[in-house]
Each structure stands twice: as structure tokens, then as C-alpha cells.
Amino acid sequence: MLYDKDRIAVAISGGKDSSVLLHILHQIENGYPDSEVIPVTIDEGIQGYRNKALESAHELCRFLDLKLEVLSFKSLFGYSLDEIVQRRTDDSFGACSYCGVFRRRALNTIAQNLEADVIATGHNLDDEIQTVLMNILRGDSGRIARTNVPRDEAVEGFVPRIKPLIEITERDVVAYAHFLELPYHDVPCPYAEEAYRNDVRAFLNDMEYRRPGTLLATLRSSEAMTKAFRQSPTKWEFTRCEKCNAPSPSKLCKACELLESIGS
């Protein structure tokens, strides 16, 4: 997952998961003098929400004596998320969908700018299984394999991503953060009420309560599915976006496609 000379961009949001991840990687990195941990965050531009989360992220970085690197939607795409939501013409495409596409692009951009070898994200077990089930329910099971590409098989133009907390439950992450009194922002995003993920989360929480071990068992099934997909002769062909030159499976990458739809 990591090498002893890695330059690691740690994606933090100010929330509990990424705060715990940064703290753990910082402790580990102290034993590897040739490696470097660089906290990075994306400012989506959500009025009344992101500024408070950024305060928590800055507080943690000061505590760990690390410099936080920030990249905003506004500077990269010309719009904040609030402005994107106001300009969207298709209400069926939720704010979280826009945010997901643009956050992934922004994280890749800032990691490339910092010449990072890898991006570490704070996805925990609950997050991962919610995503797995959402992809299955949407009829896009192939995305499970595409979003969990082994580091040594990353597509050129994409900084490899790792999920060190993928087997740790949200409950345990919270316990770690509270035990060490780590600063984090725990107010939900104002756009979260639009998220399809909420229904999936509620279902999985109920299943884990009734059938303990459901989440970890589903992770193992997901890993088996990923292995099967990757043994298939079918390959995902990437070209370059005609507009921004980013890796893309089609003429226009999803980020540019969405920017065109809102009038950019």
C-alpha cells in the first residue's frame, strides 16, 4: 500500500475519518524519515459549512505541525458548489453527484501539483460498503473494480489512491477520535439530504445491527468481485479529454461534461 520513500497526499475534510487517518499516518511516517505526509483539502465552496470544517482541518494540522494545502472549486473550475447547484438545469443530478466528480478531479490535480506518489483517503468500512451497494443498485457493478484499482495498475494521469481505513468501522473511527480528543467537524453537509447514500446507510446500519459482520462480509464479496472483474479480458480504455486533456474513457471527461451543462 505504501513505500518507505512515499510522498503521501492525505485528503482531509475536517471530518472524523480523515482526521483519524492523518493522525495515524503522521505517527507512522515519523518512523520513515524519507517519506512525507502532506495534508490536502478541497474547498467546495459551501457557505456556512466548509469554512467551519476548514477551521477544524487547520487546527489538526497545527497540532501535528503540518502545513495544509488547499484547492478550491472556485479557483479550479470557476464555480463554487453553491453556484453550480444554482446553475444546474437537471435537478435529477444531485449536488453530491456534482461534488463527487469535481472533488475527484480536484484531489488528483492538487496531488499532481505536489508531485505526490499516492493519495490516501479516509473511507472507512461503512463508507466503502455503502458505495458498493449503491453501485450494485444502480446497475453499475463494474465500477467496484474501476474504483479499487491496485496501486501498481493505476491509469497514467491518475495519482494512485489508497484507503488505509477500509476495514475499520465508523464506530471505531469515532472511538479513536474521541479517545485522543482530535479536533474534527461533525456537522453534516447541508446538501446531504439530497444524497441517495442516506437510504443505503440506513439499510446497512440496520443489517449490521441485526446481523453483526454484514459489513465485513460484504467487503470480502466486493474484493472477490473486483478480482473476477480484473481477470476478465475486458479492459477500460482511456484516452484524453478533448477539452482539458485529463484521462477519460470518452471524448469529454465527466468534469468537463458537467461544466458544459451549467454553461461554462
Language model features by range: what are they?
Residues 1-146, 166-180, 253:
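ATP-dependent adenylation/nucleotidyltransferase module used to activate substrates
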Residues 28-31, 206-210, 244:
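Histidine kinase transmitter module recognition
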Residues 46, 75-77, 151, 191, ...:
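Residue-level detector of flexible, active-site-proximal loop/helix-junction positions
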Residues 92, 101, 126-209, 214-220:
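Catalytic subdomain that performs nucleotidyl-dependent activation
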Residues 219-227:
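C-terminal-of-GTPase-core extension/linker across diverse P-loop GTPases
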Residues 226-237, 243-248:
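Short, flexible, mixed-charge glycine/proline-rich loop motifs
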Residues 240-244, 253-256:
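Short cysteine-rich clusters marking metal-coordination/redox-active sites
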Residues 256-264:
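Short Cys/His-rich micro-motifs in 6-15 aa windows
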